[in-house]
Structures are given as structure tokens and as C-alpha cells.
């Protein structure tokens, strides 16, 4: 089954109420896959993971780049482990793109020349945005502004002569291409916006109180400020605070706003997807619990 939700909606607290002898969790989250970043990514705690098995959580070093191809391979390995145990895999999705790539297949992107890749790697994030806006303005509407990886990939595709915004995962988006999977239920946790934003604001405050700035600094000291893990949402604000360039009030405001904006994009994404149905937490929990 699929359980999709924006950041802060309460996916983890819901799945910890499931029967661990029947279900295991496969997390599709581009941030929670990193080790030693549990505060800023709100990864399931050790206690929460002890209640029900989670896969694809805290498995990569912050120094490792992640993309849909790597995620697919890791997810396939995890899926087979769960199926071999004769349990029901629950796909929890915050990063809709990775889940969709797993279910529908990968984008048919052209092969990228080394010279093109080197050129893009040498560019700053702003330079990438500006050039992408010139070559393929529609692509920017589909990419989270802080997602440097996808900005780079979109630009590479355009520089190879293809419009990234025109690429399709599958022409028939009403059917899942993983015919080996029996998707019995697809849920999108659809919270009232006011409630969701209040939850996000509280979570941002708790992240700061738990030491997100120190967590970011340790990652920066060990792997460098440009490591892939630190491109995760909000860590730029954590580093700015740790460097003394922002106070706690500014840090909280920036972190909360970035998470609200991210959640808004997630909601927009999942409301357009035909494989999930919007429903409240209580209904979703009951529907999942009674799956056979």
C-alpha cells in the first residue's frame, strides 16, 4: 500500500500504530535516507523504528549523492526483503518523484556528455536557475528551488537538446507500471492547511531545540559544506545560525517558512496523482489496519 503525505503531517506516528507482524515500512524520502541527520530530517527515532521495521531510513552517508536511480535500486532490495517475510510493504512517501519513478519507471533522459556535466557542475545554483529559466522556463515550475540536484539534471537534459519539462515517466499516468505489485490501497493524508502549518511550525521549533544547528555543523566539519546531505531542506539556515549570521528568531522563521513552502508543493503534487486518495488520519489508519 501507499501512504503519501506532506512533511509534518504525521506519517511516522500513524505507521507506528500498525501491526509489525503484518507490515513493514519502505520510506521514500530523499532526506531521511541520510545518516546522522535525524533532527533536521525528522527521521523516525530509534524508538519508533523499534515498533515497526523501517527500510531506506538512515542508510547513506551525507557525502553520497542520491538520485531516483539509486533510490530505485535500494527500494527494490528492501521490497524483496519484506516480500520474502510474507509481510505487506507500506510505501511512505514524502518525495513523490522517487515513489513515482519506482512505480512507473524512470524518465527517458538522454545520455549526458562529460563536457556538459562538467559545465553544469562548475555552475552555482543561481547560474543554473538563470540558464534553465532561459532554456526551459516550465521546468522551474516543477522543481523545488533548493533542489540543486534536479536543477542540474534538468539543465543537463536541456543542454543536450531535450526539454526536461516535456519528459514523461509514462504516457498512461492512471496505471502503475509495476505489474508485479498489487497496490491495494493508496492514501494521501490530506490535512487542513491551518492544522498542517501549525504542525510544521511546531516541528521547526522542536528541530532547533533538539540541536539542528549543531547537527548541521558536525556534518559540515566531517564532509564539507557542499556535501549532498547538507543540500537537504533547512540545513543552509542551520549553518547560517551556527556561523552567527542569523539569530534564533530568524532561524526559526526561515526554517518554518521553507518547510511550509515545501509542504505546499508536496500537497500540490500528491493531489494530482491518481494512485492515492485523500483522506483523514483516522480513516487512513482504519483502512490500512484492515487490509488483507
From Swiss-Prot:
GO terms for biological process: tRNA modification. Substrate binds at residues 7-12. InterPro entries: Dimethylallyltransferase, IPT, P-loop_NTPase. Coiled coil: none annotated. Its EC number is 2.5.1.75. The record marks 95 as: Interaction with substrate tRNA. Keywords: ATP-binding, Magnesium, Nucleotide-binding, Transferase, tRNA processing. Its cofactor is Mg(2+). Residues 29-32 are annotated as: Interaction with substrate tRNA. It comes from the Bacteria. GO terms for molecular function: ATP binding; tRNA dimethylallyltransferase activity. It catalyses: adenosine(37) in tRNA + dimethylallyl diphosphate = N(6)-dimethylallyladenosine(37) in tRNA + diphosphate. ATP binds at residues 5-12. It is an enzyme of class 2 (transferase). Catalyzes the transfer of a dimethylallyl group onto the adenine at position 37 in tRNAs that read codons beginning with uridine, leading to the formation of N6-(dimethylallyl)adenosine (i(6)A). Monomer. Belongs to the IPP transferase family. This is tRNA dimethylallyltransferase. It comes from Leptospira borgpetersenii serovar Hardjo-bovis (strain JB197).
Amino acid at each position: 500500500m501507499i501512504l503519501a503525505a506532506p512533511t509534518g503531517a504525521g506519517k511516522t506516528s500513524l505507521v507506528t500504530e500498525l501491526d509489525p507482524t503484518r507490515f513493514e515500512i519502505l520510506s521514500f524520502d530523499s532526506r531521511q535516507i541520510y545518516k546522522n541527520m535525524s533532527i533536521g530530517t525528522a527521521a523516525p527515532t530509534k524508538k519508533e523504528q523499534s515498533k515497526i521495521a523501517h527500510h531506506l531510513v538512515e542508510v547513506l552517508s551525507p557525502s553520497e549523492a542520491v538520485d531516483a536511480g539509486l533510490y530505485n535500486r535500494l527500494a527494490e532490495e528492501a521490497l524483496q526483503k519484506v516480500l520474502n517475510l510474507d509481510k505487506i510493504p507500506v510505501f511512505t512517501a514524502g518525495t513523490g518523484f522517487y515513489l513515482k519513478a519506482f512505480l512507473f519507471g524512470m524518465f527517458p533522459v538522454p545520455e549526458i556528455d562529460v563536457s556538459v556535466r562538467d559545465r553544469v557542475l562548475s555552475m552555482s545554483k543561481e547560474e543554473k536557475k538563470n540558464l534553465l529559466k532561459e532554456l526551459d522556463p516550465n521546468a522551474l515550475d516543477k522543481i523545488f528551488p533548493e533542489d540543486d540536484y534536479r536543477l542540474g539534471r534538468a539543465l543537463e537534459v536541456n543542454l543536450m537538446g531535450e526539454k526536461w519539462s516535456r519528459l514523461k515517466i509514462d504516457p498512461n499516468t492512471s496505471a502503475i507500471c509495476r505489474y508485479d505489485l498489487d497496490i491495494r490501497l493508496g492514501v494521501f493524508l490530506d490535512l487542513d492547511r491551518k492544522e498542517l502549518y501549525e504542525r510544521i511550525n511546531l516541528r521547526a521549533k522542536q528541530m532547533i531545540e533538539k540541536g539542528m544547528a549543531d547537527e548541521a555543523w558536525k556534518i559540515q566539519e566531517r564532509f564539507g559544506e557542499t556535501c549532498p546531505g547538507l543540500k537537504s531542506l533547512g540545513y543552509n539556515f542551520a549553518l547560517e545560525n551556527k556561523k552567527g549570521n542569523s539569530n534564533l528568531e530568524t532561524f526559526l522563521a526561515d526554517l518554518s517558512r521553507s518547510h511550509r513552502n515545501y509542504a505546499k508543493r508536496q500537497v500540490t503534487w500528491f493531489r494530482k496523482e491518481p494512485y492515492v486518495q485523500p483522506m483523514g488520519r483516522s480513516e487512513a489508519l482504519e483502512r490500512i489496519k484492515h487490509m488483507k
